[in-house]
Amino acid sequence: MATYSTNEFKSGLKVMLDGDPCSIVENEFVKPGKGQAFNRVKMKNLKSGRVWERTFKSGESLEGADVVDRDMQYLYNDGEFWHFMEPESFEQFQGDASVVGDSAKWLNEQDTVVVTLYNGSPLAVTPPNHVELEIVETDPGLKGDTAQGGTKPATLSTGAVVKVPLFLSTGETVRVDTRTGEYLGRANK
């Protein structure tokens, strides 16, 4: 596996630290007036999700993590596991609630998601940035009911709840940003 020196550190780089795969969230090069230069690095443990800060002297190196991001198709949830399939090889992977996490509320069957694999097993699931989901439950919007800024809560087909404009009703399909959970607009169908 490749090794990365401190001058190669950048956001998103995946390295091994204390036996666990980690991702660099932030990297700051510091050159004090006196003493040796160093990197102040904010890292996220890909297994536990814990984020912490650590400093490395200039010239130190870390081993690259055997972590691969692959596009996969979400198949189904059997109550305990979420199942994903590699489109080229048709190889299937399954992840539990700790792997899927908050992404579960944005997963729609047949959607393409990014699955992070470590030693052949899923570590994390990243949904697409924008998804189209159907509204299954929302209050009817009454004319003149804009005391709250013109939005109302709506439950989507995956169970996620988002704020939508008053003119939308049950059965309509909307586009949602999965990173922020915000309504983007009606889906073009």
Curated annotation (Swiss-Prot):
Residue ranges of the TM segments: none
Leader sequence residues: none
SMART domains registered for this protein in UniProt: EFP, Elong-fact-P_C
Compartments where found: Cytoplasm
N6-(3,6-diaminohexanoyl)-5-hydroxylysine PTM sites in chain numbering: K34
Pathway entry: Protein biosynthesis; polypeptide chain elongation
Pfam annotation, one family: Elong-fact-P_C
Protein name, UniProt field: Elongation factor P
Lineage: Bacteria, Pseudomonadati, Pseudomonadota, Gammaproteobacteria, Cellvibrionales
Gene this chain is encoded by: efp
